[in-house]
Amino acid sequence: MSEFGAGSDERIHSYTPRTFDFTPEFQLDFNRRYINEMEKRPDYIGYSIWNLVDFQVDGRGDSKPNLNQKGMLTEDRRKKEIYYYCQARWSDIPMIHIAGADWTKRVEICDDSINVRKISVFSNQKTVELIHNGKSLGVREVVNGEAVFAVPFINGENLLDARSGALSDRLKIQMNRRQESRILMNLFPRQNPIRKQWKNRDRLPHFQVFSRRLH
């Protein structure tokens, strides 16, 4: 196969990535699926991921204008998560990496009872252990370069340590979790002539937005 790939922007993130949302999470999921399929098919003699490095394309209107973002490295040669994933699958040099190094400050609106998020550790070792704030989350088998852990995040600092033999990696994630707060807003300003047509002002249309209380 000549090429496949998906663009990503290290400033955008999602726990539920979707097509063309330009999150590193979608780029990883897209390429992971293609690589898994290619590895299953003996009739393919080779394939290539497009591209190694983000590059300029005048007139392109993605999340970063004039840039093709399908690279495994940013335009200034910083490694994306897909780079570490491919390294874990294909490199013989021992390595370990906790995914999410460009998503260390997270804000969420959620129920207090929901505090578990999945974290991937990329490695070419057989097993890895993940430690969260000093407590081991167990040892997982590495499958296709990746081990997935359910991490019980807390508000504030979350320190993650991944270990496999002499290899280790550390990632600090600052989490700000808040319950949703609703704000009702009128669509029409006070002096809008359309407003005069409504006899009962309490019936004015409104919409709901969900604000994030950062403090």
Residues of each region from the PLM?
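Glycine-centered loop-to-beta-strand initiation motif
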Residues: 145-147
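Residue-level signal for glycine
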Residues: 134, 169-171, 213-215
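Compositionally biased low-complexity segments at domain edges in trafficked proteins
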Residues: 186-211
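A residue-level signal for beta-strand positions that form part of recognition/binding surfaces
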Residues: 95, 182, 204
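Extended substrate-binding grooves/exosites of carbohydrate-active enzymes
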Residues: 1-141, 150-153, 159-165
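Edge beta-strands of extracellular beta-sandwich domains
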Residues: 166-187
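Terminal or standalone catalytic/regulatory effector modules within metabolic enzymes
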Residues: 158, 174-177, 190-193
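Beta-strand-rich structural segments
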Residues: 117-123, 202-215
